[in-house]
Amino acid sequence: MKDLIVLTGPTAVGKTSLSIALAKAVGGEIISADSMQVYKYMNIGTAKITEEEKCGIPHFLIDELEPDEEFNVTIFKNKVMGYIKDIKSRGKVPIIVGGTGFYIQSVIYDINFNEYGDDSNVRKKYEAMAETIGKSELHKKLALVDREYADSVSENNVKKVVRALTFFEMTGEKLSEHNKRERERRSPFDFAYFVLTMDRKKLYERIDKRVDLMFDMGLVDEVKALMAKGYDKSLVSMQGIGYKEVIDYLNGRTSLEECIDIIKRDTRHFAKRQLTWFKREKVVTYIDKDEFGTEDKCLKEMLRVYNS
């Protein structure tokens, strides 16, 4: 029996429903590993779990921050380590659920991200560069020093591009090589790490349907409400897929149809990058929804691994 469970997989694969069934089966409590669901007021565009869907299972790192508050991998790791200790102290099983593989890795391998000192000046330099030369050119600069990491991150994810460039300048080491070495570390946990997958074509169809549903549920109004509160595109939270595109639509830069198509395209690309990340992880159990057929059969296999 393991002392920590991780359930991850690409966006829209169906992690939420299975995580609730898993938590009920093992007496678990859920910690979100989603870099967007931590923000308040951002419900539709993040496909945030509802109170009804939680079925009474305690959830952490959902709706904990204002959209203008800072959230990064270091903050995530520190919070999660505290939640794991708290959950275990009550005789429950911590279950980390979400698709942000880098965040998950930081916890299960106890990675120290502050080992090279204060990087604020270097980081600010690259943040300013993103404004002056543009995110595409900044991404090209990253590719020159760390092609592998650049291939794994979108040019739209300026925060990660800046971090990788900052890390390289501060240490002289590629972040991709640093991450590989950290993955070789011995984990402080005896964990079960599940990656939920399905046929790529079916996944992309689910993504397209989810995006259509988001607009039916009122994504445009959600973004309008956020903007009315003073939250704009300069915030990391508002750079999330679905939010920045709707802002462009509201500002007249795209039509609604173009906006929807861009969100679908970028979400599919995001899912592809997630799958690439998970393939790097060594100690994982893949749960193929097509192979197992039903959620009950997926759960049965997960419980077998958890109890082994």
Q: Which role does the model predict for each range below?
A:
Residues 1-308:
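Phosphate/pyrophosphate-binding catalytic cores of soluble transferases and nucleic-acid-acting enzymes
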